[in-house]
Amino acid sequence: MKIFFIFSYDLRKYFRKYSYICDEINTILFEKRRAMNDSNTINKGSLPGLKEKRYLQKKAIIGFLYRMGELSKPEICRLTNVTTPTVSRMIEELIEEGWVIDRGCGNSIGGKRPHVFSLNPDAAYILGVDIGREYLRVAIFNLKNEPIEGILEYPSILEEQDDEATLRYVREKIDETIGHLNIDRAKIKMAGFALPGLIDREGTSYTYLTYEQPGIKSILEEMLQIPVFIDNDSNVMAMAEHTFGVAKDVNNVLCISVNECIGLGMILNSKLYRGGIGMAGEFGHIRISGLEAPCHCGKIGCLETVSSGRAIEKVAGKPLQDIIEAARKDDISAIDLLHRAGEKLGEGIATMVHLFNPDMVVIGGEIVQAGDLMLVPVQQAINKYALARMRGHCELKMSNLGVYSAILGTLMMVMEHLYDDTECGYSLY
């Protein structure tokens, strides 16, 4: 087990290149869902009328405190359209229940310093799980959007065992993580899972953990006894990059993940594009000229046969990390191997530039460790194959979230569902 320590009291010491990460999540979520109608996002029909009303009022207060950090009572009244006496009573009850902390006097912007309140970051948690072909990463996020102590990494058995054994293993490692962190399981309210391969809008996986009825989403919810959300790893990577990565606030972004396989998450007009049944972005299986090798999908000449981590490792006969280290030490064969992979990847990206006219292309996944050894040949190929006016509008960047973009994206996936007022039944409270 590897533990990547990201201390809850100071996430920014670890993520130095994007130190604004936690504040940005809260700010963006608030801007996106500030005026949500809480009465439409929870089903508590079994509660008596007055109790249901109080429940919804508390839920609204928790929601705004989660997204905005610290608020005074007048600000809470304005945001929730609830009277001061009611807000005062709700705040007192939430403090007694352990959800809210009285922070005392906050900063003044003129006049008397306001009395402010915030969420107790340990009142509830969100589970994030990134199931890769070569790794399993697990994190538990608090209400400050910080992974508690760190992101834990375990070996993956996704391609070695059947679905039942894999699920047992995932459950075992989740339990191990919870035990290692010594937290109350009952405080984990929701979970987000990232998986490689084909996943439809309903959360059914068609490549790994292929339970068609009732589907892997329902099976995980039964296993964990909490709401679970599932998406393709490239899609959640795109969500993370667009929210607090190098593609923050960029309207049209193609996020390409290069791990053992190749995937694509597309942000078009600032929204994740999923396609008709949710399976858009199988970039690794486009046909590239001059390639004749058979792909594991059964086709011939796919991009994955030359530019994926699996293809690079197959040629070199060693792990990707060792190949990258050799290239850094001026090993000509390793440099040539990465250059060819990057060149063909850039040829494929040039086609995507012509089709989608993006503002930015972000390369992420395990390949980010190669840096310019991969980025330079990719850019050269784009310059060679893409129309000048279109490539001139498009920036090419490596992810600054590194190998953690997918697991950070699982948090964003949960938050998107939590504060989407077209969905019902999801609440931290």
Please annotate each region the language model reported.
Residues F4-A186, L291-P294, K299-Y429:
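ATP-binding/phosphotransfer module of carbohydrate and carboxylate kinases, centering on a glycine-rich
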Residues R67-M68, F244, N259:
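Short helix-capping/turn signature of helix-turn-helix
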Residues D102-R103, V228-N232, M266:
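General beta-strand structural signal in soluble alpha/beta enzymes
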Residues I126-D130, I188-G192, V253-S257, G263-G265:
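Short glycine-aspartate micro-motif
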Residues L143-K144, R201, L268-N269:
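Short, ordered coil/turn segments that flank beta-strands lining enzyme active or ligand-binding pockets
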Residues G150-N252, L373-Y385:
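Glycine-rich phosphate-binding loop and adjoining helix at the ATP-binding site
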Residues D249-V306:
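Glycine-rich phosphate-binding loop of actin/hexokinase-like ATP-binding domains
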